[in-house]
Amino acid sequence: DIDHIAKTVADVIKISKATGGLGVSVTKLRATGSRLATSNTTSTGPTPFAKIMDTAIRAIQRGGKKKGALCFYMENWHYDFPDFIDWKHNAGDDYLRMRTANTAAYISDEFMKRAKKGEIWYMFDPKETPDLVELYGAAFSKRYAEYIEMAERGEMKLWKKMPADQMLRQILVALQGTSHPWLTWKDSMNLRALNNNTGTIHMSNLCTEIA
């Protein structure tokens, strides 16, 4: 929803001005190429919207003393996660890089199990899989497997796959080269949360203390 995105950008600016550090989840943003029914066009994906916030925290300094601080979180089943891994790379198109904000991968136990076993990892458009972001633990694994079956039957419009251990290597290579993305753990954070009856935790804070 474009209004929600615009409000998030405004909130980032206001909180940064008030010296706050932020964590922002971009997992719910549509995938690149996702069909927009209202305009009969396709989405540009999370990167351009993240770039707006990245630029904003550089422009709006915290208390006028130092640059704003923000960390973007994305779950690695998102269709654009391979691009997310590259957000902090020094090389490449500056429009596709985050020069001020940090990045953190929000990883499920299901992914780590698949990486350990050498299995395949699937990535989806959150528009087609809106409940995945709200699920964790066994419920996530069950629903994720259902979406995989749907994709292989040709019932999903936008999806791709790769070996899970290959994705893990890409994350670790980027982490070694750029110190990003940080690794945070969706299942651990939600299963151990004292208030997990109030809803799903979609991210950590700026410095990932609760991860």
State the predicted function of each range.
Residues 1-211:
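Active-site cavity-forming subdomains of large catalytic enzyme subunits
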